[in-house]
Amino acid sequence: MKKNLYIFYLLIVFINGCDLFSTRTPEPPINKKTAFIPPTSSDVVVKNLQSSISEKNVDNYIACLTDNTDITGKQMFSFIPTSDVFAVYSSVFQYWDLYAERRYFNTMINATPRDIIPDLKLYNQQTIPLQQDSVIYVFDYLLSVPHSVDGVPKAVSGRMQLTVNLKHTNGLWSISTWIDTKSSNDSLPYSWSFLKAKFSN
């Protein structure tokens, strides 16, 4: 009898100590903050492009580029590199598409230390409305990406021309054509095209 009481008391102490029947408070989900804004106007696309780079967020970066296709199923997004880079890396840019954009961006970001924040500065903006659903933006740019790869510039400059279109199926804007050129205002010898080529593998 005493032995049974002893076991009973032990069970009570064990249950109270472990608190087996209490409900555990769930941990709050980990949400990574992002500055990405639904691109319901053309100018938001440019802001999202800048924030996706500083946040090193490949999904937000790709979301800035159109995923529209023509009647044959071919992607309508096109990137046209600087002429000097294309002369050397024509095979790289011959079939450049969204997958190539994702690949280069991921490679570049993976080579950048976690505590380092890339930066895209845009200057001398020109805005050229084409139609109600199409706008051209022209900027001089300075892109700084302090990565750890030897032989690849950590900062590039040039002039970018972005054709931004409205997708009528969802009411969102995105970049359909991106033209990269050198300009007389360039402070650095290498362009964004060169950076894309070097990180494309």
What are these regions (language model features)?
Residues S41-V44, N48, N60, W96, ...:
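Extracytoplasmic/secreted proteins, especially bacterial periplasmic and envelope-associated proteins
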Residues D84-A155:
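Surface-exposed, charged secondary-structure patches
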Residues D19-K32, S134-I136, D140-N201:
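Short beta-strand edge/turn micro-motifs at domain boundaries
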Residues N57-T82:
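Short, well-ordered alpha-helical segments enriched in acidic and aromatic residues
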Residues T25-K32, S78-Y89:
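A solvent-exposed, charged loop/short amphipathic helix patch at secondary-structure junctions
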Residues C18-E55, A63:
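Short, low-complexity N-terminal intrinsically disordered segments enriched in polar/charged residues
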Residues S54, A63-D70, N106-R114:
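Sec-exported extracytoplasmic/periplasmic mature domains
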Residues M1-D19:
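Sec-dependent bacterial lipoprotein signal peptides
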